[in-house]
A protein has these predicted regions:
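Conserved ASCE/P-loop NTPase catalytic core
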Residues: 1-93, 99-100
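Basic, amphipathic alpha-helical bundle interface domains used for macromolecular binding and assembly
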Residues: 114-208
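An amphipathic alpha-helix signature
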Residues: 100, 104-108, 148, 152
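Conserved phosphate-handling catalytic cores of large alpha/beta enzymes
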Residues: 111
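Conserved AAA+ ATPase "SRH/arginine-finger" region at the nucleotide-binding site
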Residues: 90-102, 120-122, 141-143
């Protein structure tokens, strides 16, 4: 953001001050409580890895990673996330209510005086380099032409007006009919990129 700074002789000028976006990992807690104007400001950051203030572009740190939480129940004081913003997230996970044993574990860990130490995966000095190396390694995983065809078919199958969807059924219903009934807008090219990169990362973790 820009703040007013008083210079010599009583002269005042706007001076750029980096905000919370200038970090490696950004956690947007309850992002749906942010106003549409605030949410739209994140579009450039998430896609271009930069922000533009007063006509000047400022690059963000690499790697730049955004995580967000959303309250799916409470509606008061919340705003609908723009489709363009949701499309920029890699995954959207729905967290179910804890099961019996999970809830007991939460009780044990949060209602006693014992403290827990988080063990870092790697030291802060080498973190950026290691993450960059891992991201590069994921992209080097080979994907066959058949797999690319399959991923492309999955993405196209999410479009109601698609004519090239996979000819399959689910519980007796044709996939095309299900999509036409429940989906308004299908996944875009970013969806295909996300599925491909997720498959590559999963294959790498599996030693393939």
């Amino acid at each position: 953001t820009q703040i007013v700074v008083e210079k010599g002789g009583g002269r005042k000028e706007f001076e750029f001050t980096p905000g919370p976006l200038f970090t490696n990992v950004l956690l947007a807690d309850e992002i749906n409580r942010a106003t549409p104007k605030t949410q739209s400001a994140m579009l450039e950051a998430m896609e271009e890895r930069q922000v533009t203030v007063a006509g000047k572009t400022h690059g963000l740190r690499e790697p730049f990673f955004v995580m967000a939480t959303q309250n799916p129940i409470e509606m008061e004081g919340t705003y609908t996330l723009p489709e363009a913003q949701m499309d920029r997230f890699f995954f959207r996970l729905h967290i179910a209510f804890p099961k019996f044993e999970e809830l007991k574990k939460i009780l044990r860990q949060t209602t006693i005086n014992e403290s827990y130490t988080i063990q870092p995966v790697f030291d802060s000095g080498s973190a950026v380099a290691k993450v960059a190396e891992m991201r590069k390694l994921v992209r080097e995983v080979l994907v066959s032409s058949d797999m690319e065809d399959y991923i492309t078919s999955i993405i196209l199958a999410t479009h109601p007006d698609n004519k090239d969807a996979l000819d399959s059924t689910s519980g007796g219903d044709n996939i095309t009919d299900l999509v036409g009934r429940y989906v308004t807008y299908g996944a875009g090219p970013r969806g295909a990129q996300a599925v491909t990169l997720a498959a590559k990362a999963n294959a790498l973790l599996d030693g393939r």
